[in-house]
Amino acid sequence: MKYRTCLTTLLYSFLLGLILPASAQNSLQHQKDSLRYALEHAEGIDKLQIYNKLYYIYMAEAGDDQKMDTLMTLFEQAEAEAIRQGDTQMQGMVYGNRIISYINRSEHDKVIEKAPAYLDFYIRHDLWKFYYQIHMQLITAYNLKGDYELAAAEAGKMYTRARERKDKAGMATALYATGIIYNLQRRPKEEEDCFRESISLLWEVSGYDNILTQSYAFLCVSLRAQARYDELLQLVPNMKKPSPASRKPPAGCSPKLGEIFMWH
């Protein structure tokens, strides 16, 4: 499993949905028109939620330059409305989705330019789940440009902040990011150590199933690279255990208000 290939597949899988039959295109346009009409009459949090739904639709079409331009305009409008209402959570979500849109289009320099200010915003307003998600995207941008030293420096910052807060999910995310850097550098033993520690922490929290699943996948890759096949097979029973999220409800906000839109 090559990280770059897998990551590219994840980031661009949404493009498969761009070639749609006319009926589907008409349905999307109808949704857009309905949401734009609703925007004219909405107020308060309802208006922010409508912006949220509308730009989600355009994010799925961001491979088209014209749709990307429209999406950026929507982000600007949603940001202005969130600032007007004093809703820092929705403002932070706009910033995060803007970064995801740049990543999905391989605009890595844009991510590197914009992300640091957004990370500062998340820190000031205690939006830590957003912070970890978008710090991961900054690290991803450096990785995809081959700037592994800068990627490692950012992962180190993430881990330090999480450790200071005794935030196990944040520490696990930073270790996951570091493990990916070692994978790209073909350092399987260090990669293994990072993913083992990340997995150990993730089993103590909920709401991070995607990172937990991918950590197991990368751990298998690192063991295979070291020809430790018996240990690889021993991982299977652990991977079949119920996830942390199935043992207790995830912490945090509802999907509408608390999650950055991520392509999987």
Language-model region placement:
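Bacterial N-terminal signal peptides
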Residues: 9-21
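Bacterial N-terminal signal peptides that target proteins for export
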Residues: 1-11
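A "functional boundary" signal
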Residues: 23-264
